[in-house]
């Protein structure tokens, strides 16, 4: 952690939010991806993050610790003419909650913007402190 701790903390939040946005974009892009019956259906990617504890109890930001797949069963849609239909005529749809992804998209976007606001405010505070010394 540098002397510009608030910048580092906010930057970690922005990185986590960007990873979250990337995962959401990937999930939305694959909302209609269908795979052959012998392959697992697409599952939404979930970003797993944890708080980074600081020695002084304040904390040092956030870290992405992994990407997991969403739980749940794929929706079975009867479409015997689809090339990926199983022997019973069912196609397994992706495990992606589009409405949930859109809600997460708004939250991730707001989180990213808030962290960038902290970066800007911290930078302005440091610049003001430097001007005092002149």
PLM-predicted stretches and their roles:
Residues 1-134:
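Amphipathic alpha-helical polymerization modules
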């Amino acid at each position: 952690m540098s002397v510009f701790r608030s910048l580092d903390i906010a930057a970690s939040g922005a990185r986590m939010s960007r990873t979250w946005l990337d995962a959401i974009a990937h999930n939305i892009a694959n909302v209609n991806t269908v795979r052959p019956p012998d392959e697992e259906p697409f599952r939404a990617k979930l970003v797993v993050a944890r708080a980074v504890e600081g020695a002084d109890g304040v904390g040092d930001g956030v870290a992405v610790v992994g990407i997991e797949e969403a739980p749940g069963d794929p929706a079975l849609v009867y479409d015997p003419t689809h090339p990926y239909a199983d022997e019973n005529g069912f196609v397994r749809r992706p495990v992606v909650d589009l409405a949930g992804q859109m809600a997460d998209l708004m939250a991730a976007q707001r989180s990213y913007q808030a962290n960038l606001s902290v970066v800007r405010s911290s930078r302005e505070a440091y610049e003001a402190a430097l001007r005092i010394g002149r």
